[in-house]
Each structure stands twice: as structure tokens, then as C-alpha cells.
Regions:
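Hydrophobic alpha-helical targeting segments used for export or membrane insertion
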Residues: 9-17
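Bacterial N-terminal signal peptides that target proteins for export
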Residues: 1-9
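Acidic, polar-rich low-complexity tracts and alpha-helical solenoid repeat scaffolds
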Residues: 2-3, 15, 21-167
Length: 167
């Protein structure tokens, strides 16, 4: 009988923890939980795909020695006569977008009036993003867009990163 109560209590504790860590709440526990699930679920799959596609792109690209040799295969996107490197970074971009959509915490935390005199705390409260790992997803998305050859989207992503994540 005691084991049954122990199992029920552990399941209830797990459910309570999972449901209390939503992106609509901004507590230390929810930030930690969202950062952990971002890092070890969606971001991990995105970074693994990124590494695989980058290795694919670098190994399959053949230089044309009758023309100017590029330092990196991405440089070939600038010349329409050059062979383009192949690498599908779409899955990486999708994973980053999923991480940002599902795990972004933009709700402001409850203000602690005792800490409002601290300049670091005031800067923290002014942030727009409170998941401590989301900036890595944005950076990976910008790099994937760059290696895909979508330079305008990559530059827009990098500008967004510099505006919102320079703390």
C-alpha cells in the first residue's frame, strides 16, 4: 500500500513540475526547465544536422582550379558561373524556429522591489527574452541561413541578435 502512495506521489510531483514550467510563467524553475529542454531536445537535433550538412558541403564541394579558388564553399554563391555547394540546412533552420517558437519566454518576471536599486537587476528586467539558451538558437539559425546562401535572411537574423541579445 505504501508503494502505491509513493508511485502516485512521484507521478503527481512530475506532473506538477512539468505543468508549472510553462513559457507563460517567468520563474527561476520555468526558465531553467525551458533552457534545459531547448538545449537537449530541439537545439541538439539542430546542431547535429548543422554539423552533418557542413561536413557534407565541405567534402562534396570541388574547386575549379581554372578559375579563382574560393577560401570557403560559401564564397561560390557570389558568382553565378561557379558550381554551388550543396547542403540542406533547412532542417536546422526549422529546428531553430521550433526552439524559438516553443521555448521563448518573453513575459516579464515579477519585480523584486528590494533589488530595483541594483543596475544589473534593472537591466535584467528590461530584457525581451528570458530563456537563457534562446540566443544560441538564433545564432545557429543565422549561421545555417548563411551557409544555405540566404544572405539577406542571415543578415537580418544577425542584426536581430545584436539588437536583442547584447546584455
Amino acid at each position: 500500500m505504501r508503494r502505491i502512495y509513493l508511485h502516485i506521489a512521484s507521478i503527481a510531483l512530475c506532473l506538477f513540475t512539468v505543468f508549472s514550467c510553462s513559457v507563460k510563467k517567468n520563474t527561476k524553475l520555468s526558465r531553467s526547465y525551458q533552457a534545459m529542454t531547448t538545449r537537449y531536445n530541439v537545439y541538439f537535433n539542430g546542431i547535429e544536422n548543422y554539423k552533418e550538412q557542413l561536413k557534407n558541403m565541405e567534402s562534396n564541394y570541388e574547386d575549379n582550379f581554372t578559375r579563382l579558388v574560393h577560401m570557403h564553399p560559401v564564397s561560390a554563391y557570389g558568382n553565378p558561373k561557379e558550381t554551388k555547394p550543396n547542403g540542406s540546412f533547412d532542417r536546422t533552420i526549422e529546428k531553430c524556429q521550433k526552439a524559438i517558437k516553443l521555448h521563448s519566454i518573453q513575459k516579464k518576471p515579477k519585480r523584486n522591489q528590494n533589488k530595483m536599486h541594483d543596475p544589473k537587476y534593472r537591466e535584467y528586467v528590461k530584457r525581451g527574452e528570458f530563456n537563457p539558451f534562446i540566443h544560441n538558437a538564433w545564432l545557429l539559425m543565422g549561421k545555417a541561413q548563411f551557409y544555405k546562401g540566404d544572405f539577406l535572411a542571415a543578415s537580418a537574423t544577425f542584426i536581430y541578435i545584436t539588437r536583442h541579445f547584447t546584455w
